[in-house]
Amino acid sequence: AYEDFITYLFASFPTLFMVGYPTLFILETAVMYVYVYSWDPLNKANKKGRHIVTGVILNILGLSLLVALDGPATFMQTPPKPLNELMNIGEWAKIANSAWMPLNYHRLVGNGTFGGYMVCVIGAYMYLWSDKKEDREYYDWVGYIGNLIGVAIMLPLPAMGYIFVREIYQYDATIGMYIMSDRESMFMLVQGLLVGTMFSASNIYMWVSMKRIENAERFFPAMKFGFVLIIIAATIWFTPRRFFATMMPEPGMDSAMVLPDNLAFLALMVSKNTAAFCLVTVTFINYIFYTIATKTGKVAYGKINPLGPYVLIFLGFADIWLMSWMGTIRSLSRMNWHIYKVFKDVTPEKFAPTLAESGFHVTTIVWTFFVLMTAIIWIGIKYPKTKKKEAQPTAVPQMAE
């Protein structure tokens, strides 16, 4: 069945898979090598602008690859209608399906956030493993910049998620109900819990970071009030109407697991949207305080509270886990279809895995990635790239004539 499905998918996107994908992949790899190995010669020649341009080209190629592969991914979820005419439409129409652009927006913001928090992780590791004062100051600054990027790009992330789900509902409300109120409702609960935790952790880092900035204490009273709002908003965001796997109570389930009627409004989308808006707004205000403090006061880099680097590492891990989890939710939303209502999954694995099983697989993958990344950073510190020392000229005795 999987062989037939892959054959069908490749036949639907022949130009993309046979020409577009390999070309973009090879070009991106080549430009990446140029970017890495051109730094030293361009730096010596004082031509850093060329290196920046190379970096821009590298990002454009990477984004092009991302957008291109979003086509088949969304085609599997929202194939163009009418479905009986699917074999008569062109490849571009299959790529530019209903969910293609919303997923592009969501992944673009998600990958930008991921990039910022990966800088945080690298800066935090290097800070914790550095002995020299100058190195700790530098990597403290790296963590600060990474958090600045990660938080700034993360702010519109909930809005991108709403745009994507709205398009799903417009295409087929059955998919949306399956995600929000049916078998994947508890998956979304975990997603809400993690997003709320990430917003809280980002604000905690800004708080800890501002304690080493002169005259930043003037913002602390407002930030303390903001933390109260963040906790309330995050709690509302991941509060479900019931803890059943489906919309209806199942046999053997305790009816006390349903919110009382006087609190049922907490599970409505009006409350969720208000909570999300509050989370984003408070984080944005704290972000402004953070930026003003760094511009108007002296930052004592290298003297951050020890909690700071560990918060950055947590943010990086949580972001990777969240990206993997959202991919799981999107894939499972097709239910027992390889391509929704076009190509049915008839394999024994067509069932939706449990929350525990999905969490185990996602966590295993994320831990593997994180351990490998940690090992790469550790090797870079343990065995740094050193330049060969130039041989000093030595005096050679001359024979007297």
What are these regions (language model features)?
Residues 1-55, 161-176, 243-255, 259-261, ...:
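Membrane-interface helix-loop-helix modules in multi-pass inner-membrane proteins
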Residues 1-6, 34-51, 119-147, 163-172, ...:
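Juxtamembrane membrane-water interface segments of multi-pass membrane proteins
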Residues 8-23, 88-110, 177-192, 258-276, ...:
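Short aromatic-rich membrane-water interface segments that cap or initiate transmembrane helices
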Residues 24-32, 111-119, 194-201, 277-286, ...:
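Hydrophobic alpha-helical transmembrane segments
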Residues 41-89, 94-192:
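Long, contiguous internal "core" modules enriched in hydrophobic/ aromatic residues
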Residues 55-76, 148-162, 224-242, 309-330:
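Hydrophobic alpha-helical membrane-insertion segments
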Residues 184-243, 270-275:
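Hard-cation-handling environments
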Residues 263-401:
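C-terminal amphipathic "assembly/sorting" segment characterized by alternating charged
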